[in-house]
Amino acid sequence: MSPAPWRPHDTGPIPVVGRPAPPSAAASRPTEVLPAGATLAPVELTGLPTTEQPVGKKPGRSGRDLGAAIGVALALGAVILLSLLVWRPAFLLVLTAAVVVATIELVRALRKGRFRPPLVPVLAGGPVMIGLAWSRGPTGLVAGFLITVLAVMLWRLAEGPVGYLRDAAAGVLVALYVPLLAGFAALMLVPDDGAARVVAFIVTVVCSDVGGFAAGVLFGKHRMAPSISPKKSWEGMAGSVSACMLAGVLLIGLMLGGPWWGGLIFGAAIAVTATIGDLGESLIKRDLGIKDMGDLLPGHGGLMDRMDSLLPSAAVAYLLLSLFAPA
């Protein structure tokens, strides 16, 4: 069998001497000239690590560094527990420091939007409210809040009328959201068994977060509020309620001598308020176009991001503990 004859590759028509070669297809297309000042659109390279996801480091299902989050949570829990066991007023110092930091974070976050709440009066009002709640009870807490609101309104007058209502309302929101609600934790600390009350409150809120996270990761399919918090599911909510009710029965019954059915109600209520607090802060962050209130705590964001479920739950916990386990 003879080999196939050799044939040259087709390189197009052979040019004729004295006649210009026909233009190629690429050369026949008109050249696009960018207008002055224009830039080429960036090309996105897929499959390469980004700055948000370092090489060799994968975030958890929650989108955060789970190891760092657990470590920070344990450290915070140890500080709170130690302050309650060693000397009860030491917890007031921890609470006051947390209120100051969370207030700064919230004011800075609001200023990234169109709000300009005055920082000085709300920052000074936090320790005042905590101290009056400890020394004067509910009346002192309310009085401290009213004094702070008046200070916010007067302080903002110095900047003129433009945006006054907007900024003063934002300042009142900060005073209500952080120091006023945190003051209920100070009220829980007042009775002789105040340390046990605070522990029961915090542990139940933690059970809400842990139960909701575990159930949401394992079984979450039906989104609760996709436009606010896409990762929250009704299955996770069921896990929060179940974990809180179990914790409520054990803590109210064993630590505070309350009825078991009171523990069920306490746990269910804390699960609801903790979820509302989480969703409420997520709504504020989405409105402001930010992911976290700060970056103080690795794996968590800011301190305000950890207090979002604690703050509204503190008021409900104080009221229900006063009802089911009166001092």
Segments (PLM) and residue ranges:
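Hydrophobic transmembrane alpha-helices of multi-pass small-molecule transporters
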Residues: 244-245, 313, 322
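Juxtamembrane C-cap of transmembrane helices in multi-pass membrane transport proteins
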Residues: 189, 284-289
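Membrane-embedded alpha-helical segments of transport systems
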Residues: 208-211, 238-239, 304-314
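Juxtamembrane boundary at the C-terminal end of a transmembrane helix
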Residues: 319-327
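Interfacial loop-to-transmembrane junctions
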Residues: 287-310
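Alpha-helical transmembrane segments and their lipid-water interface positions
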Residues: 212-216, 281-285, 309-312
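Membrane-embedded alpha-helical bundles of polytopic integral membrane proteins
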Residues: 2-268, 272
